[in-house]
From Swiss-Prot:
It catalyses: beta-maltose(in) = beta-maltose(out). This is Maltoporin. Induction: By maltose. The lineage of its organism: Bacteria, Pseudomonadati, Pseudomonadota, Gammaproteobacteria, Enterobacterales. The record marks 143 as: Important in sugar transport.
Amino acid sequence: MMITLRKLPLAVAVAAGVMSAQAMAVDFHGYARSGIGWTGSGGEQQCFQTTGAQSKYRLGNECETYAELKLGQEVWKEGDKSFYFDTNVAYSVAQQNDWEATDPAFREANVQGKNLIEWLPGSTIWAGKRFYQRHDVHMIDFYYWDISGPGAGLENIDVGFGKLSLAATRSSEAGGSSSFASNNIYDYTNETANDVFDVRLAQMEVNPGGTLELGVDYGRANLRDNYRLVDGASKDGWLFTAEHTQSVLKGFNKFVVQYATDSMTSQGKGLSQGSGVAFDNEKFAYNINNNGHMLRILDHGAISMGDNWDMMYVGMYQDINWDNDNGTKWWTVGIRPMYKWTPIMSTVMEIGYDNVESQRTGDKNNQYKITLAQQWQAGDSIWSRPAIRVFATYAKWDEKWGYDYNGDSKVNPNYGKAVPADFNGGSFGRGDSDEWTFGAQMEIWW
């Protein structure tokens, strides 16, 4: 009995410590991928992306180690009111050695307060750096609506027929603005702050199993006093988005239409590039003139076709029409079927095609890419992760144009512009060729 009594304080202390640890538990989430690959003609794994396309089909076609490590915690709660602190640090290396030093990217650090406004139950106030309501196509790693960055907002306001969200974020360009210099010389190497103001109305039930989301984004260059932009800079622009999501075959289908103007056309996802400049090989700012418009029509989804088959798919048309004729027309179509041999083993195939036409030359670049992978994953869904896969990829391309980045923009009037593949006896784009790669990769999110 004496021994039991002596052990009691220790047991109480341990229990209190466990309860305290549970109360202060930190949420750990993230994403990572890494692997090793070879190229059929020799050397390390090559990855294949069509010149002018903004993404590539990713299965068996990723050549880097990438990770996002998220730590977060609910730091205060009283009734239904709470504060949550969230962080995210990302890393990317070329996966060529054991020791690969890299500077981390501090991508998220924000606080979200839920139900803090009595007359707006269910809403969230937030401020800080944040991945904000991002919309993407997983199989091509393409974010078509993403205003992430430092910002603040009020989201998920219940308006009866949907949820209203308001936000403002910042996306600064590395250069583009200039202060006065002697002899009226401007270098345009100062950072340009771009503000984006976002309004969304989501979760509107428009048909059985279907919801509609509408959004408007306005972006503008926010100059400091006595600074100026390059003559003809776009300064501002708009992005309009409509997305219909339909529940179908134990999955979903998303149909998206987007239209953007001027500064919102460069990235086409909601981030503004108001100064409209870039830097050449000599770090000299040159005008890329993103005045114009963009139209994007996109359909993508993931479905289940019986007990053994799942499939992802995408089809997209995008037309960037710039006043300087340096835009592109890009269309892409692809599928990723998955056959499940057991609840944890599957065979996955990805077939994708890209075609990009240059507005300036009228020429087209195209690429076919096919990957076959044997995969072991934590579950029987096409979304199940972690996954370990061995793969073989074949790509064939024929490119008739490329971008001219020879010399610098002060002496090369075509710098940064699309030119035919054999322009001035040179070689632009990737030509007409094909290649095999093979390897192994892990992918995880949690």
